[in-house]
């Protein structure tokens, strides 16, 4: 066990209420007008719910935690403009929920904080413009029509184009700060957005030099994410976010390999961690190695300035796939190589295989790191030979060996003051895509158990 495996923000006390495994979070009904494709005689109950994108400890109350929604209920859809997403609750705004574990183990929702732009207007979950994080994902409305600037008129690429939202967000990572504000990472930009306690945007950091909203200024220059982060895959952005105990450094992890320079990197087991010091502006970047290319990193919680708990899973339902994996690793960056300092890497290496590119980052044999690793898994060993060391990871919890966890996703980890870890699944608003259409999200192959947001607890061994 690490020396301080605690919620670093919470004073030690004896008031920590126990978690009953699998306790349900409360939800309401957002929509009940669509047919449930699995059982056409029934209605699809879209639940809100959806507080499973991430979790974070309340800064002072050891029994409270924050949980995050994503962009809202949506499904894969192919319409008149091609493949995209159908937004089944089009006016949905992403939000943060504050929850409390009561003495009897039940969970109470205390409040919701709707995310808003700098003018105090609720943001949507619609995609961003192409230049600022969009991937040309087409949004469709509940009738299957393209969502346009003027919904009263038909689509026209010149006079009435597809609607995007400059401030639209697909939230995935959450850091709750001691001052009551929040940093959120998303899957569009990726963007890192700082919200005040009321959910109004204060600051923003992303990879786009032309975005005037990047207003975290250090020594006269805006802080920007490394340029290669703009090559994130659709729906595979900055899935995880935390802040170090000193409240100085944001730490984010990408869900999967990025499209760097293109889709050829998707077969890689490489993901990237970024550390952003909000005080001095220093940005560091480290390489993380997944157990398998099909796995994803999905949550992070800081233990110290160099150690973190990070979730890794395979998106499989344990009740349907006996080989499913749900894991918590401890990451240690103390011996890892900062690959963001490209000039230093180049200057300190006499190896002609190492090159640097301002848009693609570190290159090996003129290939991006994603391409290099996708080409041969043994290339991880070559990186070490070149003096480029990935993050060290040690298994802390094999969740499926420790508890009954029937969910496909593991996206929220809540570090508690006794060293335990609260686990929160993403229920996708209790809905899922299927060959027949949109249906409830079922945990079992017979489609009898509907998924829902539930809280679990595990005890790490390191």
Model-predicted regions and their roles:
Residues 5-462:
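Sequence/structural signature of beta-propeller domains
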């Amino acid at each position: 066990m690490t020396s301080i495996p605690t919620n670093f923000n919470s004073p030690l006390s004896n008031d920590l209420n126990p978690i009953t495994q699998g306790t349900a979070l409360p939800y309401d009904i957002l929509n009940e007008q669509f047919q449930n494709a699995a059982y056409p005689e029934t209605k699809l109950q879209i639940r809100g719910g959806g507080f499973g994108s991430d979790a974070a400890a309340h800064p002072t109350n050891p029994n409270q935690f924050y949980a995050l929604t994503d962009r809202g209920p949506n499904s894969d859809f192919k319409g008149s403009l091609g493949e995209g997403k159908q937004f089944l609750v089009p006016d949905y705004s992403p939000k943060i929920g504050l929850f409390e574990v009561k003495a009897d183990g039940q969970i109470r929702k205390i409040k919701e904080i709707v995310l808003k732009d700098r003018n105090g207007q609720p943001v949507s979950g619609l995609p961003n413009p192409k230049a600022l994080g969009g991937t040309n994902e087409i949004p469709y409305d509940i009738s299957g029509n393209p969502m346009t600037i003027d919904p009263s008129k038909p689509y026209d690429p010149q006079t009435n184009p597809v609607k995007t939202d400059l401030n639209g967000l697909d939230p995935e990572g959450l850091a709750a700060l001691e001052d009551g504000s929040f940093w959120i990472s998303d899957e569009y930009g990726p963007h890192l957005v700082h919200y005040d306690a009321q959910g109004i945007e204060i600051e923003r950091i992303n990879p786009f030099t032309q975005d005037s909203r990047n207003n975290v200024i250090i020594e006269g220059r805006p802080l920007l994410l490394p340029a290669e982060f703009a090559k994130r895959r659709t729906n595979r952005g900055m899935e995880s976010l935390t802040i170090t105990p000193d409240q100085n450094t944001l730490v984010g992890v990408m869900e999967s390999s990025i499209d760097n320079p293109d889709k050829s990197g998707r077969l890689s087991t490489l993901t990237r961690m970024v550390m952003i010091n909000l005080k001095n502006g220093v940005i560091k970047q480290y390489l993380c190695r997944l157990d398998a290319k099909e796995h994803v990193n999905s949550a992070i919680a800081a233990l110290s300035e160099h150690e973190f708990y990070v979730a890794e899973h395979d998106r499989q339902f344990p009740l349907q796939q006996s080989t499913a994996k749900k894991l918590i690793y401890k990451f240690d960056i103390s011996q890892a190589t900062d690959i963001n300092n490209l000039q230093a890497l180049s200057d300190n290496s006499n190896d002609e295989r190492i090159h640097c590119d301002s848009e693609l980052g570190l290159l090996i044999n003129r290939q991006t790191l994603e391409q290099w690793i996708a080409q041969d898994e043994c290339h991880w060993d070559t990186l070490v030979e070149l003096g480029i060391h990935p993050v060290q990871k040690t298994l802390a919890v094999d969740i499926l060996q420790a508890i009954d966890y029937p969910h496909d996703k593991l996206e929220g980890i809540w570090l508690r003051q006794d060293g335990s870890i609260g686990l929160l699944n993403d229920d996708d608003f209790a809905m899922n895509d299927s060959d027949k259409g949109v249906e409830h999200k079922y945990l079992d192959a017979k489609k009898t158990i509907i998924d829902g947001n539930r809280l679990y607890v595990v005890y790490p061994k390191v």
